[in-house]
Amino acid sequence: MKALLDLFKQVTQEEEFDAIKIALASPEKIRSWSYGEVKKPETINYRTFKPERDGLFCAKIFGPIKDYECLCGKYKRLKHRGVICEKCGVEVTLSKVRRERMAHIELASPVAHIWFLKSLPSRLGMVLDIALRDIERVLYFEAYIVIDPGMTPLTRGQLLTEDDYLSKVEEYGDEFNAVMGAEAVRELLRTMDIHTEIEKLRRELGETGSEAKIKKIAKRLKVLEAFQKSGIKPEWMILEVLPVLPPELRPLVPLDGGRFATSDLNDLYRRVINRNNRLKRLLELKAPEIIVRNEKRMLQEAVDSLLDNGRRGKVMTGANKRPLKSLADMIKGKGGRFRQNLLGKRVDYSGRSVIVVGPQLKLHQCGLPKKMALELFKPFIFHKLEVLGLATTIKAAKKKVEEEGPEVWDILEDVIREHPVLLNRAPTLHRLGIQAFEPTLVEGKAIQLHPLVCAAFNADFDGDQMAVHVPLSLEAQMEARTLMLASNNVLSPANGEPIIVPSQDIVLGLYYMTREKKAARGEGMRFANVAEVQRAYDSGQVDLHARITVRLREFDVEVDGQKREKITRYETTVGRALLSEILPAGLPFSVIDKALKKKEISRLINASFRRVGIRETVIFADKLMYTGYTYATKAGISISINDMLVPPEKEQLIASAEAEVKEIEDQYVSGLVTQGERYNKVVDIWGRAGDKVADAMMKQLREEVVLDANGEVAKDAEGNPIKQESFNAIYMMADSGARGSAAQVRQLAGMRGLMAKPDGSIIETPITANFRDGLNVLQYFISTHGARKGLADTALKTANSGYLTRRLVDVTQDLVVTEHDCGTTEGLYTKALVKGGEVVEPLHDRILGRVAALDVLNPETQEVVYPAGTLLTEDEVEHIDALGIDEVKVRTALTCETRYGICAKCYGRDLGRGKLINMGEAVGVIAAQSIGEPGTQLTMRTFHIGGAVSRAASVSQVESKSNGIVHFTSTMRYVTNARGEQVVISRNGEAIIQDENGRERERHKVPYGATLQITDGKPVKAGQALATWDPHTRPIITEYAGRVKFENVEEGVTVAKQVDEVTGLSSLVVIDPKQRAGQSKGLRPQVKLLDANGVEVKVAGGEAPVSVTFQLGCIITVKDGQEVGVGEVLARIPQESSKTRDITGGLPRVAELFEARSPKDAGLLAEVTGTISFGKDTKGKQRLVITDLDGVSHEFLIPKDKHVTAHDGQVVTKGESIVDGPADPQDILRLQGREALARYIIDEVQDVYRLQGVKINDKHIEVIVRQMLRRVRITDAGDTSFILGEQVERADVLTENERVLAQDGRPASFEYVLLGITKASLSTDSFISAASFQETTRVLTEAAILGKRDELRGLKENVIVGRLIPAGTGLAYHETRKRNVAGVDSAPAIIEDAGNVQLEETSGNPEVA
């Protein structure tokens, strides 16, 4: 019967749409949706279970309960379709109309919609220009509002209390009209003339000068203009008719035992209906005003709760004191409609099971349990059974499959052949968390996974589970095979390095196989080819590690792809010779002629991918894996307690450290060092001692004596024992990178060392024992401290990291490659990244896979090596390196001019595929995943490992690392003192060392107060000191000579006298202004200089006198009236007193950068280029004046406790730092521009990741910065429709400007706005995407008022509305549809599109020899 009914169901045509609009509904509109009015609060009759008439579930309004059957049962069957029963009034139709038919409630009194009232900023308040508090007082019947003042002195919109109103009525009678409640607000809205209001505001906007006012007017103007444009009437924000949700969407289900389970909405609706009916009755009875008012207020509250429970006043609760879930709660939050049902759908044809290792699989295969496959591929099996004639109907086929006969298994084998399945492991942090494999059937119930893909899935076999999904359609299968097959995903999209890299056992096996042993069996034998070596090894004539000579065949791949064989004799080991058998043709033997550690193997696979292509590499990786496992098994490496060799020197090292500590303690007791210094030094001593023990241990582990064939110690000619690299199992595991690290081995056999407390501070007594000797109770207890902290941190970290990824994905989800070339000539000048004199990232790494924005010129001949628009691959960057070019301008995502997307040329190479990115690639999501995925590896905060900190602090000089010529940057300033030393007086001077070709080799920051050991333009040798300084104090140096004159230096007021107990010398120390008494707070202790005539020395080229301010904690070393020369020290600041500012590190730092938060005590940048002088100080602030080149002066007030790095008379350029402190990204953007900002964010983010050893390509960060900068602020509206100060999408401004210019108008000018990722996600054009991210209510409220249209450009919106996403193959589909809609036949166009998407099909199963 059911199948028969299906024939009659009308096939509903799927609607095709291009955009979704949201707007306020008018009362008429609501009535037009409705199928009738709900008049009674009853739901269903508890005896008959039939819905009550006119109730919330009424069948007459909403439709029948059963298909094609009216309620009283008079009409049944299909033949009566469409009849309306005259007895019960129910239309005979499908029962599913109860999911779509709405009803309405006619409200007896209008009610304000709470979203437009309470969602901040209040829209009602904005339109009426009345404060929210006042509107609430009117709505909730606490005050009257004047609607029509008539001939009275009252004004429209004025509030009157009850008493006011009565006195005014006595005074003026019925001249004026004042009302309370929603009727009043509705009347005000209805009688408002939007048009004149807008004109008035536009006029005001032009006249006013105050910032705050402009902001306020612009906001109001935006809303009013939206009302005008979209044709939405403001009075619709007040409801007269309330729509009722279809009953199937708020079901009422009878439970056994006569109780009902119901949706909270029914309760909320019942309250509204009850109060509404009561109000109607009261109005009919002409009840006293006060009772009616109370009922109206209750109705307002009931409707408020229905729409958004708990937004105002008390939360409505059900019978069990639980808050009721309102309509707003249904759509927002993680469990709401958007994130739970639209973005988090469950899919059919999927299963999950535990994974086990499948070492015999090929890279593109997985093992699928038979039981699972049978269930997943059921429809295919049914079809096959029918085709083969083994079953006549689906039912018969079903039965056959349930019997699981032999023919079913044969068919299953047939069905899954070449049909890829998708495997996914949660959490899916990047696109490699879902990959396609060809299933092979296995017994048992566990999925078998190829070991090499574990790194991509971050899987291990300790009970992890994975989900299997079946791509059904042919297109889906093809995409899975060409794009997602594991063998096509060799490279990581985050950094372009191979991700299919052997680890653990495989590494150990390969390492063991390629090590060499001295005096091993068969050393020095010669072999004609590898086959002979294999035979000798199999018969035990020669040891795996023996040095032998062998002839090997290698293949050179010519340029034209021809392979040329050459035979060479190599002296190598047996293991390496055997390994050479699996080397792909085209790779030289030299790449494996070394002990293969993990890093080496990674390089090997990378080289293979670049030289012989993906297919050979995949086969090679598989063979490496099989070989590694085989030899790891043969090696039989195991560890025992005797492998942990404790160094004999350990006792003595610890004893000497203890003696040093005792000495420090004695110094502390006698008052020579402070508590802080003592702590730092003790921690430092133990840190060093631990390192020494570790070094001794590693040295002992690293070497062993060689035994000859008889087991005697082998000796060389002089009779000394021969040593070789150790075959100690623990050492081999750590050295090869298979498991463990030097730090862990150190804990096993050295000493555990210093431990951290949960707050990150170091406990100064270290654990001197190791795990081999065992810990005592105290040591064990100290260990638990750090361990517990680690576990707690991990849990927090995972949540935080996931949230960061979510925000990143949300801000970039609509960024897709939409065109090939946007034609811009902009880009970023890129050079090698140098930190502290070391090249952290060379130029070739930074420009690899980018497109040149300008011609790359040969520095010697100035001829074009690579024209602009060239994609720089490995060969090109090597060539650029060889030519010694040190700066290249490359295209970048930041400067791409494509609107709604990005162009392939600006993005450059697709890192996961190794060639120029394809059209339709979702680069935004890839960027977000690449940055978010390593998030869990980042620490929550950087610990100051005390030892590390104090050792870093005691750097006292910079040395050159290479030979070359020294140059100082323009910011370097120094003076020569009486001793002829050159003392640096600039804060950010740098010394650059260039080689003979003038290329920059290294650059070093030279701190203030350092003594230069070299002069500008002179040659230096490697290792030569460039500058030295005292690491423990920061000096304050005078640039001018003269006689010292103190100002405000008063003992006991601004400075305190300190007498050193040991030496008896006294010195003056500046007191913290916060601790000073009343008047003296504003005094600044400073020094002026007088010349021979007693006149104040002036700043060179200026009128201001030289004055040097002493800051907090300064120890003043000069006396009043003392003569000082240039470059002499006036005072010094002890370094330990200036506390190490706690650096935010790890994950919070990355989040802080992407959220573009201004740091707490940010430094100040110069707003203009000019000369600095100091003005008159105010209370607590110092006044700094910059006089620009036109002589205009700009004043800045700076808190006293801030340290001004600039000094009187200094010339600063716009954007230069003048006050110490972390940079504020907003300032960088405003003063130095987008490129500087991008560079700042990229460098800072990379610093955090580099610290953890994570590689991420810069372009991912650039993509995110592009999204953070996509909004602009209008600085001059010109003839466009924008409002001054409005924030809009950059693309919209450009489009609008083009339109205006075409009509010879004046375009709008704008400045870039930097938004944090959360803000940027919420301010996107797509309201669907923003609403599903955060603050759903606010987003939807705003969108409804503006009558917003969502063009469905991003990925997220399309997922939500259930269309193909406009990325990948979906992009071509949408383009074609758009062309079809435009009426252009587009068959050829899609072929061209497909041409752009080069799919590399790797054959299904590469045969492994």
From Swiss-Prot:
Q: What is the superkingdom listed in this entry's lineage?
A: Bacteria
Q: Which GO terms describe its biological process?
A: DNA-templated transcription
Q: Which Gene3D superfamilies match?
A: 1.10.132.30, 1.10.150.390, 1.10.1790.20, 1.10.40.90, 2.40.40.20, 2.40.50.100, RNA polymerase II, clamp domain, RNA polymerase Rpb1, domain 3
Q: Where is the signal peptide?
A: none
**Keywords attached to this entry:** DNA-directed RNA polymerase, Magnesium, Metal-binding, Nucleotidyltransferase, Transcription, Transferase, Zinc
Q: Which residues bind Zn(2+) 1?
A: C70, C72, C85, C88
The residues listed in the UniProt record as binding Mg(2+), with positions renumbered to this chain, are D460, D462, D464
According to UniProt, the reaction catalysed is: RNA(n) + a ribonucleoside 5'-triphosphate = RNA(n+1) + diphosphate
Q: How is the cofactor bound?
A: Binds 1 Mg(2+) ion per subunit.
Report the EC code(s) recorded for this entry.
2.7.7.6
> Do you know which InterPro entries this protein is assigned to?
DNA-dir_RpoC_beta_prime, DNA-dir_RpoC_beta_prime_bact, RNA_pol_asu, RNA_pol_N, RNA_pol_Rpb1_1, RNA_pol_Rpb1_3, RNA_pol_Rpb1_3_sf, RNA_pol_Rpb1_4
* Listed GO MF terms: DNA binding; DNA-directed RNA polymerase activity; magnesium ion binding; zinc ion binding
Task performed by this protein: DNA-dependent RNA polymerase catalyzes the transcription of DNA into RNA using the four ribonucleoside triphosphates as substrates.
What is stated as this protein's family in its record?
Belongs to the RNA polymerase beta' chain family.
Q: What is this protein called?
A: DNA-directed RNA polymerase subunit beta'
- What species is given as this protein's source? Methylobacillus flagellatus (strain ATCC 51484 / DSM 6875 / VKM B-1610 / KT)
Q: Which gene encodes it?
A: rpoC
